[in-house]
């Protein structure tokens, strides 16, 4: 548990590398780590807390308990019998969680250690990049239930695998393998199941050792710049760059290079 954050009922938090990396684990393995209303509320709360004050955390790793299912999507047992109003009210919770996550200034690595279906794949798509087990499957199955992806799936998946492939995946609802996900560029690396989280933590440590303001500005520039006309995006990148010129870390980085030592970045 990370003592600087509250205890959650549906999430486990573990601090790594002297508090620079936070491992966030979805913790409802008895129901395939499916999202219920409480999990949505707790995730939103955590993302908002990290946005306001990260307490020194420079990188997140998101994974799940149980090892077989990363996340099965929304808890359909909880949704069974919901009125239209109850359904929409719950989905607003999931929407707020989604927007809070994609607006996180610090990077999030998804360590997808089990099957990721529906909303489970959608939250994975909200991560900055993914590592996955080599024996799992992904799917957006919403059309088989009379709905459609509603937490970024129709926007994030095409940006990851291309529009035509995303249409086939979403319109058929058919699952695909981690090997296919790697081939299509959805996941960066695939590993043996027991190695996924450790590999993600290792990469998180590397990211956390870099200048945190530089990492944040890089994430911001890529995310927002990719939605702009190219020339505007170039200028947006320069504005992000210019914010780093007047920082202590910029001075420290150049000084450390010339002194042939490892820099000590403080995020100032």
Describe every region a protein language model picked out.
Residues 44, 64-99, 116, 146, ...:
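Glycine- (often His-adjacent) and acidic-residue-rich active-site loop
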Residues 102-213, 243-247, 251-255, 261, ...:
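Crotonase-fold acyl-CoA enzyme core
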Residues 1-20, 51-55, 67, 173-179, ...:
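C-terminal alpha-helix plus adjacent terminal tail
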Residues 24, 28, 43, 62, ...:
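Terminal peptide-recognition signature
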Residues 1-63, 81, 99:
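Conserved CoA-thioester-binding segment of acyl-CoA-metabolizing enzymes
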Residues 39-43, 90-93, 123, 196, ...:
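Hydrophobic alpha-helical membrane-association signature
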Residues 6, 19, 55-57, 74, ...:
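Structured loop/turn residues at beta-strand edges in well-structured enzyme cores
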Residues 34-37, 72, 81, 171, ...:
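Phosphate-coordinating loops and pocket residues in cytosolic domains that bind phosphorylated ligands
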């Amino acid at each position: 548990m990370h003592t600087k954050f509250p205890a959650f009922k549906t999430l486990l938090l573990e601090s790594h590398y002297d508090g620079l990396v936070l491992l966030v684990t979805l913790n409802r393995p008895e129901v395939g780590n499916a999202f219920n209303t409480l999990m949505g509320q707790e995730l939103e709360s955590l993302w908002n807390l990290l946005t306001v004050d990260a307490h020194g955390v420079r990188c997140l790793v998101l994974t799940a308990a149980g090892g077989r299912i990363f996340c099965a999507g929304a808890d359909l047992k909880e949704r069974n019998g919901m009125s239209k109003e109850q359904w929409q009210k719950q989905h607003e919770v999931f929407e707020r969680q989604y927007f809070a996550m994609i607006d996180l200034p610090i990077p999030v690595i998804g360590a997808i250690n089990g099957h990721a279906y529906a909303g489970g794949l959608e939250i994975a798509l909200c991560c900055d990049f993914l590592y996955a087990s080599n024996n799992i499957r992904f799917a957006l199955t919403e059309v088989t239930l009379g709905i459609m992806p509603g937490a970024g799936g129709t926007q994030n998946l095409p940006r990851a695998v291309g529009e035509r492939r995303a249409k086939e995946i979403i319109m058929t609802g058919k699952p695909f393998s981690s090997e296919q996900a790697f081939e299509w560029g959805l996941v960066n690396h695939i590993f043996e199941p027991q190695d996924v989280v450790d590999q993600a933590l290792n990469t998180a440590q590397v990211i956390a050792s870099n200048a945190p303001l530089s990492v944040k500005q890089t994430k911001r520039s890529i995310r927002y710049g990719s939605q702009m006309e190219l020339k505007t995006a170039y200028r947006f990148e320069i504005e992000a760059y210019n914010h780093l010129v007047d920082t202590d870390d910029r001075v420290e980085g150049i000084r450390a290079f010339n002194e042939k030592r490892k820099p000590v970045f403080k995020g100032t």
